[in-house]
Every structure is written in structure tokens, then in C-alpha cells.
Amino acid sequence: MSVVGSFEQLERLRDLFYKLLDLRDTLRERGVAWPKPLSEEAALGTVRVKVGFPAMLKRGVIMDVTNVEQAQIAEDAGAVGVMVLDKLPYDVRRAGGVARMADLKVIEEVMAHVTIPVSAKVRIGHYYEAFLLEQVGVDLIDESEVLTPVDEQHHINKWMFTVPFVNGARELCEALRRISEGASMIRSKGEAGTGNVAEAVKHFKSIYGAIKSLAAGDEERVRDFARQCQVPFELVALTAKLQRLPVITFAAGGIATPADAALMMWLGADGVFVGSGIFKSQDPRERAEAIVLATAHWDDPETVVEAQKMVSERGAMMGIDIRTLKPEELLQTRGV
């Protein structure tokens, strides 16, 4: 499987990307159109581009939003992207019924009003929701267990699309299966809509614990694991060699405070998704800024202290103890 050779190369690609964005904004201010040949000749859909784009989001926060106002708050707070939904995961859990892709009109409105990347969720196995999002022009598609799956046994073949996909995973086999299907980015599933980061912690420790075990083993151990997971040997071998997943890996599921975000970064996340934790809180602007600060500077305790002081526990979303949920109420078990 072809992947970008090194994360140093991805860092340079990210720097180039931001320079191009600055140039684009300067040209817009001067009333000059963006040179057409650059957009026409872009290598859309290649593995290098699809894996490279998420790498530009490292140390960043992608926030769930349901409208333009929330998207603008996220952008002002420093989010590296927004994820457009019809309902926030907390509300999806409360509402029940069938959760589907957000309205295309809302997605287009958000795209028209912010300059950061715009993502949206599709139901597991729903090819046509993904086709529609690709046609609309989103930057990233999340094949998400938060929405009601249309196929309990099969995920989307993501190699068919030019848009990069992100998928959730609870353990290493699940993550590698999604990558073998073409996922350009992995996130922990956690337990969305609970404001409880415990499951995300469990999933990250499971994934990286298994990788550490593989890295300490021999080739036969890698082959056995590949057979067990039903994924290519080369993918498992690459993961063992890198001692991490070969794609960008974000934390998601229950992140509600700056300390939660810093914890997940400390456990090895490249960045975080925040779902209900911001816009189901009483202080969304301050909390968004604080989580962005803590994520970007997780390895500087003084800055994380500063970020944590920006919010109050009294303003946090009301969390749900996962131990009180019935098995059929768990979202993380959707997908295989």
C-alpha cells in the first residue's frame, strides 16, 4: 500500500498548504481570480493527497456543528475544521429514531461562510450519501456510527472516492480494516454524545497496546495478526514498523474539557474531534477556544492550566455515565 513516506514530508506539505491559503486570500482581497490551471491539474483522489490532507490538521480540533453560526464560532476559536450534522450526538442519542446525513443546503451554507475545511457524516454503508457529499465538495467524509447504519456488515469501499474518509475504531483490527477499505484517517469511537471520555481512552490504549505488542514480535506474529484481522500483511507490517497507525489518528468520543483533549493527545492522538462537548455546554465560545489551546499545546502543562482556567465545570455539558447505558444504546458497537 502506498503511503506518504514520512511525517516530516507531511509537515512540509502542511506548511505549503497554508502558504497557498494565504496567497489565495491575498488574491481575493485584490480582486484577482485564483489561477485556473492550478485547480484543474490538482491530483485529486490520489493516496498521497488523501492521506496528506488529514496530516495538515495535526494538533488541531475539528468541531461538530449544526448551523452557520456554530461553524463561525468554531472558526473564530481556531478549529482546523468543522463537521456538519443534522443534530449533535447528544441530541441524536436523546431523539432516537433514524439519524441521517445533514441537509445538503446547510452543508453548502456552512461551506460558503467559513474558510476552514468542512466535513460531514454519512451512515455506515450508505454509498449514495457519500456520492452526494463528494458532489457538493466537502473536504472530508466521516462514515459514522453516530448515524443509523444502513449496512450492519459492510462499510463503504472508500477507494472509489476522491474525497478522504475518516472512520472510527475501538481496537487495532477494526482500524486496519477501515484503512484497508481506503480510510485516510482514523478516530477513536469513544461513546459519542456522553461527555464521558473514558471509552475514547480505552480505545486508544487498546489500539496502541496492540501495536506495541506487534512491534515487539516477529514476522510470523505479524502474519498471524493479519490473518486474524483479515487485512493485508503489508499493512500490518507497516503499522508494526512505524509503531503507530500509518494514517493520521484523531481522538473522538466524550471530549468535553481542555484536560480531556490534552489527555488524548498525551495518549498518542494527532488531534481531536469534539462533538457535543462545545455546543451543548453553557460557554461554547470560551470552551471552544480553550480546547483548541489545550490540544495545540498539550505538551506544555502551563498552557493547559491556562486553557482549563478559561472554562468552568459548572458550564460543561451534563455527562452520561456509560455504565448506565443498555447494550442497545451504545453507538460504538455499530460497524464491524
Swiss-Prot record:
Pathway: Cofactor biosynthesis; pyridoxal 5'-phosphate biosynthesis. PROSITE patterns: PDXS_SNZ_1 (PS01235), PDXS_SNZ_2 (PS51129). It holds the Pfam family SOR_SNZ. The active site is at K121 (schiff-base intermediate with d-ribose 5-phosphate). Its EC number is 4.3.3.6. It is an enzyme of class 4 (lyase). Keywords: Lyase, Pyridoxal phosphate, Schiff base. Transmembrane segments: none annotated. One of its GO terms (molecular function) is amine-lyase activity. Disulfide bonds: none annotated. GO terms for biological process: amino acid metabolic process; pyridoxal phosphate biosynthetic process; pyridoxine biosynthetic process. SUPFAM superfamilies: Ribulose-phoshate binding barrel. D-glyceraldehyde 3-phosphate binds at K205. D-ribose 5-phosphate binds at D64, G193, G254, G275, S276. It catalyses: aldehydo-D-ribose 5-phosphate + D-glyceraldehyde 3-phosphate + L-glutamine = pyridoxal 5'-phosphate + L-glutamate + phosphate + 3 H2O + H(+). Coiled coil: none annotated. In the presence of PdxT, forms a dodecamer of heterodimers. Belongs to the PdxS/SNZ family. PANTHER family: PYRIDOXAL 5'-PHOSPHATE SYNTHASE SUBUNIT SNZ1-RELATED. Catalyzes the formation of pyridoxal 5'-phosphate from ribose 5-phosphate (RBP), glyceraldehyde 3-phosphate (G3P) and ammonia. The ammonia is provided by the PdxT subunit. Can also use ribulose 5-phosphate and dihydroxyacetone phosphate as substrates, resulting from enzyme-catalyzed isomerization of RBP and G3P, respectively. This is Pyridoxal 5'-phosphate synthase subunit PdxS. It comes from Pyrobaculum aerophilum (strain ATCC 51768 / DSM 7523 / JCM 9630 / CIP 104966 / NBRC 100827 / IM2). The gene is pdxS.
